[in-house]
UniProtKB/Swiss-Prot annotation:
Protein name (database record): Glutamate racemase 3
PANTHER family to which the protein is assigned, alphabetical: GLUTAMATE RACEMASE
UniProt: substrate binding residues: D15, S16, Y47, G48, N79, T80, T186, H187
Keyword Isomerase: yes
Pfam families per the UniProt record, alphabetical: Asp_Glu_race
GO biological process, alphabetically ordered: cell wall organization; peptidoglycan biosynthetic process; regulation of cell shape
SUPFAM superfamilies from the UniProt entry: Aspartate/glutamate racemase
EC number of this enzyme: 5.1.1.3
Annotated family: Belongs to the aspartate/glutamate racemases family.
Top-rank EC class of the record's enzyme: isomerase
Protein task: Provides the (R)-glutamate required for cell wall biosynthesis.
């Protein structure tokens, strides 16, 4: 389908910051032989309170940058970007929302699904709309948790402040008797322990869209014969600003895949 050499090109993964590392982790578990290029917009995070126009402009810059890195597919590892993304070219693009929607519909038994995400994601009602396209009888309750991403990006992901925010975020969803909760932001798996604790005794199954996404990507590149036959799982990281929390979280999630030699700073506004 594509030129044979493209199978050796890396997979491009991008997010507003550290959240996309949870997606990269899943991809590397499912496709360990692939090489990856990761971009985190750590200078302009969070995206959740930005306008659609800003997010679209930032996304275009990031994708232009990743094209220069010869990525064979793009993985949008950010729900906020996914919620406003409009495909323009012929690029192969996967996003977490599509995967999360499919997983949520397959998971729910009582047809009551909760979604926690950024303000932009929940205001777009992207999960509600796409879930109802599949099954109109499913009720979807979306709650914005705007405080979480800034706290996680600052490195406060194991604090009482985060715990309190999580409890407040899921409180109303528990009252709606949901049986499925979608993590509608890729930062949230980083605080999964607090989320699970807040849901103890509620018999709620948690959906991390990245799990389905990784297998969707694998299925696609296998089908079009684009699996890298001799890759080594290398990752090149690019950030718009160096932050200690990014390095710390990457070391925890990716277990040795990040060091001083594979992290570069890029002025993304030039793209």
């Amino acid at each position: 389908m594509w030129g044979d050499k493209m199978r050796y090109f890396p997979i491009g993964v991008f997010d507003s910051g550290v959240g996309g590392l949870t997606v990269l982790k899943r991809l590397m578990e499912v496709l360990p032989q692939e090489n990856y290029v990761y971009f985190g917009d750590t200078r302009r995070v969070p995206y959740g309170d930005r306008s659609k126009e800003e997010i679209k402009a930032f996304t275009k810059q990031i994708m232009n940058f990743l094209k220069k890195k010869n990525v064979k597919i793009f993985v949008i590892a950010c729900n906020t970007i996914s919620a406003v993304f409009e495909k323009e070219g012929k690029e192969i693009v996967f996003n977490v929302v599509e995967a999360g929607v499919k997983s949520a519909v397959e998971t729910t038994c009582n047809k009551r699904i909760g979604v926690i995400g950024t303000r932009r994601t929940t205001e777009e009602r992207i999960y509600s709309n796409k879930i109802k396209e599949i099954n109109k009888s499913i009720e979807v309750y979306e709650v914005a948790c705007p405080e979480l991403v800034p706290l996680i990006e600052k490195g406060f992901y194991k604090t009482e402040s985060v715990k309190r925010v999580v409890i407040e975020c899921v409180k109303n969803l528990k009252e709606e008797k949901i049986d499925t909760l979608v993590l509608g932001c890729t930062h949230y798996p980083i605080v999964i322990d607090y989320i699970e604790e807040a849901l103890i005794g509620e018999n709620v199954r948690i959906v991390d869209p990245a799990e389905r996404l990784a297998y969707d990507v694998k299925e696609y590149i296998t089908r079009v014969n684009m699996i890298n036959p001799n890759g080594s799982g290398q990752v090149q990281f690019y950030l718009s600003k160096m932050t200690q929390s990014f390095i710390e979280i990457a070391k925890i999630l990716l277990e040795g895949k990040i060091n001083n030699y594979n992290v570069s700073i890029v002025d993304i506004t030039k793209y």
